[in-house]
Amino acid sequence: MSSGQSFSRSLLKLPLSVMVKGTTIPSNPIDDLNIDLTKPIVYALPFRSNVDLLTLQKQAMSLGLPDPLSPLEINGKTLNRFVFIASRPTVMGNDNDIPTDSVSLFTELLELHKLDSELDVQMIPATVLWGRKPGKEESHRPYLQPMNGPQKAKAVMAAGRDCLVRFSPVVSLRYMADSHGTDSAIAHKLARVARIHFSRQKLAASGPNLPQRQVLFARLLKSPAIEQAIEDEAKSKDISIEKARKEAHDIMDEIAADFSYGLVKNGDRILSWLWTKLYQGLHINNASTVRRLAQDGHEIVYVPCHRSHMDYLLLSYVLYHEGMVPPHIAAGINLNFFPAGPIFRRGGAFFIRRSFKGNKLYSTIFREYLAELFAKGYSVEYFSEGGRSRTGRLLQAKTGMLAMTIQAMLRGLNRPVTLVPVYIGYEHVMEVGTYAKELRGKRKEKENAGLVLRTLRKLRNFGLGYVNFGEPIQLNQYLNEHAPEWTKDIDSMGGSKPQWMNPVVNELANKMMTHINDAAAANALTLCATALLASRQRALSRDSLINQIECYLKLLKNNPYSSTSTIPTESAEELVDHAISLDKFVIETDSMGDIISLDRSQSILMTYYRNNIIHLFALPSLIAQMIIRQRNLTVEKIQENVAQIYPFLKKELFLSYQEEDLNDLVVKTLNEFAEQKMICLDGNKLEINQSNNQPLVLLGRTITETLQRYSIAMNLLVAYPELGKSDLEQKSQDIAQRLGRLHGINAPEFFDKGVFTAMFNTLKQQEYLDSDGNCDKKKTQKFAKLLFTLLYPEVKLTIEESIHQLQA
């Protein structure tokens, strides 16, 4: 290092320490990027810059990484630990050539690998981004630009508190040397590849250049599809082309986002304060997978579950803090009220009407706008359920936006399109009380400013929030597998709907929802709610509750539901203490200790949180209930019974297990029960351990309400095999409501007609009903008999009496 460089860096350190507050992506690069600290490390930066180097130094050392300014010793040679891929421009001109000293360092490092077969230098590309404002569409400048001295000083002053230091996956120089050789040409190639990589990093962090809104409208109005729709509108309404075009412009103005980086940047500060006030922390998982997709140039479509209006803000906030661009979000037109509407719009929301069936002009404009977002490379987010879940369960997907996504691909997109399922979980959903009222028949209140103000008054500590990114679904690959000749239907005009579209979209929607549930996050409140609701009086002693949570944790840890689901790291006792601190339970103390219970209103609210994770326990709960209710069971009999019931659970709860894996899963679950000493397993036979049967009983009760619903429908079919779809759904709902009143079942979804509708579809798929709705009575009787064996006698009696009264 020259003395001049050393002096200038020492001068810069003090002002930079005051003016720069960097954020690192990822926050824990050593673990997230699998950096091996026992191997030599070299940092690669895009441009020669002492400011960037010193900023990197501060962040690297705070993370436990080597100091970029410390010398690198390899086999007796002392080398720089950093390399610049391009020179720094000056006010007199720009020199983008790769610096000679950088090429020399690359060449020397590659040569050292040639001489030492054990050597493996890790190169870590690192980008220092000063602000993340996207460019303007009319600009032809590159995404990542070098800055001269005055420009860099201005950037530090303007964006020093918004500085992002982004570490990329390690590049093994051992691999480069072995695969490509060690001469200077390879060193040049390595530098060129790094330059492309840095440009992609900037694009992933800032997003594509933004158009002016009116320029976008003008471009859309010239699209052949919209021009044709305007002509058709003019003819059908007998109005002038100018008036129809004005209508089209008004629709665009209603729909289109007006993204503002300034609002996002300032909004981030407000949201950081808000999350700190509301939540004790946010847990984010698997974000690195999404970052890789963004950096590799994928068109990303986020498809989160929808629990709360908070979802809009939370996911954008998390993505921004994970170094990615907040997406353009499809929001219901009901949210376009003052002042929320304009704020959401400038934060990236575009608004969609609840229904636009029969409105060709609107549907064409919306489809063209969505295709434009995809074509320009903006990430998009839409809620696949169509609205917020009032029960806490994942709803059946609305497929309209998914179909339009595939239609956009049929326009000839030149980038891969990938769905990213997102599970969002909370320990408190602020609308949950409203949901319970709506499910009891109260009319939904229209969103307005007054509602927002009333909600803000309720803000308090809501515990923890969770954002888990699920396994991505690459649509190009999916279409190649399920519609191999889909590329033949590519049409630049758009709007085509090939015959394969509907079945493929329906299958894709089910896969998407399954991947969302796969990424579920169990937490203190959902686990405690599950346990308390399984007890007969909605009450457990503190010790029993801790014991039950311990049972759940072992099940989830030893037999993980999926690779993307998460479980708490705290002990059962710590989780119970945390759940109690959320002030949702009744705590009473007697001479033997604390009793934790739910009153009636709390029981209804707690079903929401239980339903968030009920799918995680569906199979273990079903097996437990069989063991509790059926005697002299063998492993084979359990496997047979599970195979009969599982298709209904799979459809209703979006379970990911494949039918061919069920037998192995049953064995693994039984082994875990035995390990927890809930049962004694002797080869093919098993029996309950009576000295430790409470965890098994509580586990089994979690699924009983679902089995009761199935039993109602199946026994109705046995009694009335000629029942049609609507009659079966209505009578099932009537009996479920009666059962709920007589047996204190508070779960709102217990008599939800939509759940019976989903079951009716499964009855057809499993051939209990043929295509004309005729019942296979023998098969239905067998299933109804099995379900009855899993119910408690008093519930079974109520179902029999209710069906008998209908017959009378």
Swiss-Prot record:
The keyword Membrane applies. It is a peripheral membrane protein. Signal peptide: none annotated. InterPro entries: GPAT/DHAPAT, GPAT/DHAPAT_C, GPAT/DHAPAT_LPLAT, GPAT_PlsB, Plipid/glycerol_acylTrfase. SUPFAM superfamilies: Glycerol-3-phosphate (1)-acyltransferase. Its main location: membrane. Pathway: Phospholipid metabolism; CDP-diacylglycerol biosynthesis; CDP-diacylglycerol from sn-glycerol 3-phosphate: step 1/3. GO terms for biological process: CDP-diacylglycerol biosynthetic process; fatty acid metabolic process. One of its GO terms (cellular component) is plasma membrane. It comes from the Bacteria. Its EC number is 2.3.1.15. It catalyses: sn-glycerol 3-phosphate + an acyl-CoA = a 1-acyl-sn-glycero-3-phosphate + CoA. One of its GO terms (molecular function) is glycerol-3-phosphate O-acyltransferase activity. It is an enzyme of class 2 (transferase). A motif (HXXXXD motif) lies at residues 306-311. The keyword Membrane applies. Belongs to the GPAT/DAPAT family. The HXXXXD motif is essential for acyltransferase activity and may constitute the binding site for the phosphate moiety of the glycerol-3-phosphate. This is Glycerol-3-phosphate acyltransferase. It comes from Vibrio parahaemolyticus serotype O3:K6 (strain RIMD 2210633). The gene is plsB.
